[in-house]
């Protein structure tokens, strides 16, 4: 275990698998105390707690739906009770529903924006008073390539991610006076979501194979570490793409 985040407390939503899991393990290995949040899969949460313990780290795992303000407030209160502060927030929770623009129902549209965009809003708003009081904080949001270039079958997902990019820039501007940096990562990695998207495009468009190979989530975790540490103290309101080759 190294010490890039020694003494820091990080909250990571969508942390039970994929990118969130890789980031949680990376932060724990760098000395952070990590709160891992997921909407489902208590077994996966228990597993990541065990893995962090093997690293010599400290963690708590919680089930919560970030689209519900009450759930988010409960997470924040639990973290404060446990550790008394929150230094880093990673807004990674997300869902993916696939289908053409014409087929998207109002229910699907609202659910996707609720988890991605409203969830990012809820979590960010909940930690602002804490970070203001600390006069320091790091917030890392998640975009997607589809928000930048367009993609078949994910119009609602892309719209939510585009909103997160705009939200990131506005939050960064508003919170800069309190030494709170807000940045955004657009990751491409080998996760369950990319597998589902690849399969959908193959069936819908006749694409026989992946357009590219994807890196493992662990490969892009250092980008999150950069935005979580003092190395990025002079960087805010930025969006970077990671894992796209």
What residues fall within each predicted segment?
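Substrate-binding pocket helix/loop in short-chain dehydrogenase/reductase
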Residues: 100-101, 108-113
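C-terminal helical subdomain
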Residues: 184, 205-245
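Active-site helix of classical SDR
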Residues: 124, 160, 168
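Conserved glycine-rich Rossmann-like NAD(P)H-binding loop of the short-chain dehydrogenase/reductase
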Residues: 32-47
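Residue(s) in the substrate-gating loop at a strand-loop-helix junction
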Residues: 144
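Conserved glycine-rich cofactor-binding loop
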Residues: 9, 16-17
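Alpha-helical segment proximal to the catalytic Tyr-Lys
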Residues: 129, 173-177, 191, 233
């Amino acid at each position: 275990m190294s010490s890039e985040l020694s003494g820091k407390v990080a909250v990571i939503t969508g942390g039970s698998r994929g990118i969130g899991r890789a980031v949680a393990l990376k932060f724990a290995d760098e000395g952070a105390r990590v709160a891992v949040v997921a909407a489902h899969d208590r077994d996966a949460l228990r597993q990541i707690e065990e893995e962090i313990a093997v690293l010599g780290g400290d963690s708590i795992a919680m089930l919560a739906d970030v689209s519900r303000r009450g759930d988010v407030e409960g997470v924040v209160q639990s973290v404060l009770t446990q550790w008394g502060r929150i230094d880093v927030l990673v807004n990674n929770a997300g869902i993916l529903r696939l289908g053409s623009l014409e087929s998207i129902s109002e229910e699907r549209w609202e659910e996707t924006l609720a988890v991605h965009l409203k969830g990012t809003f809820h979590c960010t708003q909940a930690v602002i008073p804490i970070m203001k009081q600390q006069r320091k904080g790091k917030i890392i949001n998640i975009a997607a390539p589809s928000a930048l270039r367009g993609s078949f079958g994910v119009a609602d997902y892309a719209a939510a991610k585009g909103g997160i990019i705009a939200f990131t820039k506005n939050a960064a501007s508003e919170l800069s006076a309190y030494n709170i940096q807000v940045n955004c990562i657009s990751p491409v990695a080998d996760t369950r979501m990319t597998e589902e998207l690849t399969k959908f495009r193959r069936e819908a468009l006749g694409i026989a194979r992946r357009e590219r190979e994807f890196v493992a989530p662990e490969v892009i975790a250092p980008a999150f570490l950069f935005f979580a540490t003092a190395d990025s103290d002079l960087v805010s309101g930025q969006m970077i793409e990671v894992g796209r080759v």
